[in-house]
């Protein structure tokens, strides 16, 4: 290996390490701010300190603080008012309570519902996506890959990818439906049980590849291809979860909502 190649590889690894540090740091700052909101240090309606004040408090750059604020905004905990500041609009506990009365549905029933809804969302998103939307999806996908290489059991980027697709449609009803489907997942005891069995990164790696296929279709504005890619992605998830399931479990719903490789309407 030449000296120049070694330098290039060193620079590439350094850049990746720095990106990983940034991702871990903004998540940590976001969690600390969420704790402050939960503990009542900042109440609903309160204005959060400025970027400069938060960066000085935690000893991080203002860029890190900005990313943490975006994280809180995505989670609907704060609202950014241009020219005014960032305000607390909800607490983490209120969001949890809001969805605590949702029924515990089986994972395969949930995946079937997601398959029907999200394939249409992907189709529409392919027609609506802007350059900014594509860039956002790429950033989320890169975060998924980084979390995988770090062997972190963190699937937040997976959720962000699917929610970002719904937001591209600019249809608030679709966004709310998508958010609720994810809450069904978080409330599902059987889903949690199955998820705990996904110990091999191979599964997550395959799903990231599916996300790349979906993104490529959207980037090409190929609505039909985007719909089929999303349908197949969730079909792949169903197949893997079926393999991991205990079919003797009385709550197993895999036979009621079985695999269906055919995309409806094609």
UniProtKB/Swiss-Prot annotation:
Keywords: DNA-binding, Repressor, Transcription, Transcription regulation. It comes from the Bacteria. Residues 51-70 bind DNA. The keyword Repressor applies. Coiled coil: none annotated. Residues 23-91 form the HTH gntR-type domain. One of its GO terms (molecular function) is DNA-binding transcription factor activity. The keyword DNA-binding applies. InterPro entries: GntR_C, TF_FadR/GntR_C, Tscrpt_reg_HTH_GntR, WH-like_DNA-bd_sf, WH_DNA-bd_sf. Repressor for the uxuRBA operon. PANTHER family: TRANSCRIPTIONAL REGULATOR, GNTR FAMILY, UXU OPERON TRANSCRIPTIONAL REGULATOR. This is Uxu operon regulator. The gene is uxuR.
């Amino acid at each position: 290996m030449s000296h120049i190649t070694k330098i290039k590889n060193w620079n590439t690894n350094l850049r990746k390490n720095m990106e990983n540090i940034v991702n871990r740091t903004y998540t940590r700052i976001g969690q600390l701010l969420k704790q402050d909101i939960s503990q009542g240090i900042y109440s609903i309606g309160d204005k959060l300190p400025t970027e400069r004040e938060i960066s000085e408090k935690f000893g991080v750059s203002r860029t890190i603080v900005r990313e943490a604020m975006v994280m809180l905004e995505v989670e609907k905990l704060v609202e950014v008012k241009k020219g005014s500041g960032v305000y607390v609009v909800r607490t983490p506990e209120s969001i949890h309570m809001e969805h605590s009365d949702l029924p515990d549905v089986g994972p395969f029933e949930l995946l079937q519902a997601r398959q029907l809804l999200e394939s249409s969302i992907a189709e529409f998103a392919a027609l609506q996506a802007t350059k900014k939307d594509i860039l956002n999806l790429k950033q989320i996908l890169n975060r998924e890959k980084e979390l995988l290489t770090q062997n972190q059991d963190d699937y937040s980027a997976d959720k962000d990818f699917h929610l970002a697709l719904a937001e591209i449609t600019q249809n608030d009803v679709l966004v709310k439906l998508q958010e609720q489907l994810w809450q069904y997942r978080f409330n599902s005891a059987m889903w949690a049980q199955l998820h705990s069995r996904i110990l091999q990164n191979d599964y997550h790696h395959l799903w990231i590849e599916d996300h790349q296929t979906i993104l490529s279709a959207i980037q090409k504005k190929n609505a039909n291809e985007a719909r089929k890619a999303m349908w197949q992605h969730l079909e792949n998830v169903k197949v893997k979860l079926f393999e991991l399931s205990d079919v003797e479990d009385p709550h197993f719903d895999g036979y009621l909502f079985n695999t269906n490789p055919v995309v409806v309407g094609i």
